[in-house]
């Protein structure tokens, strides 16, 4: 949705086809029921609902990971917004999101889900910021520009240090991201 909103802003004053596209995007934006993903009135958003399984997956979106943008969009929805408590209790885990970890001397500021000590894949630092500029974005938990910068710097330093001796890691090959497999065939095998 964040990318569509960027497109909408770009084409809204364009030709008739572009204006029609902007109107469709706006209709979709107004129709997104972010508040429904609270699974009742819980102060957290849930990953998904299925017509076959309902809320069975029971996967709350808690930070820090790529889901920050979901809370930003949900809070700013013109029709189906969520209360601030949803962000603070859900995303920020009632303050439990804060971290004192400093991999390679770079403060993470936030606990990266599943990678609290050293930070997670850079996908987490990129996805929410496709259409959201982290510069000057702060709240009581973090300065998000620092979060993104320090995450990238610690990732870079990890690859330069290469503590596990992975082939190719180094100052010219870094930027680890999330994948669902461990065997790559091109250009070379890596982990």
PLM regions and their residue ranges:
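Ser/Thr/Asn(+Pro)-rich, low-complexity disordered segments
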Residues: 1-184, 191
């Amino acid at each position: 949705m964040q990318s569509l909103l960027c497109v909408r802003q770009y084409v809204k004053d364009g030709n008739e086809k572009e204006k029609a596209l902007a109107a469709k995007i706006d209709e979709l934006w107004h129709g997104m029921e972010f508040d429904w993903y609270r699974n009742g009135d819980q102060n957290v958003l849930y990953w998904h609902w299925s017509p076959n399984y309902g809320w069975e997956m029971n996967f709350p979106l808690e930070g820090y990971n790529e889901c920050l943008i979901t809370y930003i969009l949900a809070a700013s929805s013109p029709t189906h917004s969520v209360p601030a408590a949803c962000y603070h209790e859900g995303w920020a885990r009632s303050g439990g999101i804060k971290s004192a970890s400093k991999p390679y001397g770079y403060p993470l500021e936030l606990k990266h889900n599943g990678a609290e000590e050293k930070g997670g894949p850079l996908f987490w630092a990129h996805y929410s910021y496709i259409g959201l500029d982290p510069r000057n974005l702060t709240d009581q938990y973090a300065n998000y520009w620092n979060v993104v910068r320090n995450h990238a710097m610690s990732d870079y330093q990890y690859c330069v240090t290469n503590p596990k001796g992975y082939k190719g890691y180094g100052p010219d090959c870094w930027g680890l991201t999330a994948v669902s497999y461990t065997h790559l065939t091109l250009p070379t095998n890596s982990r």
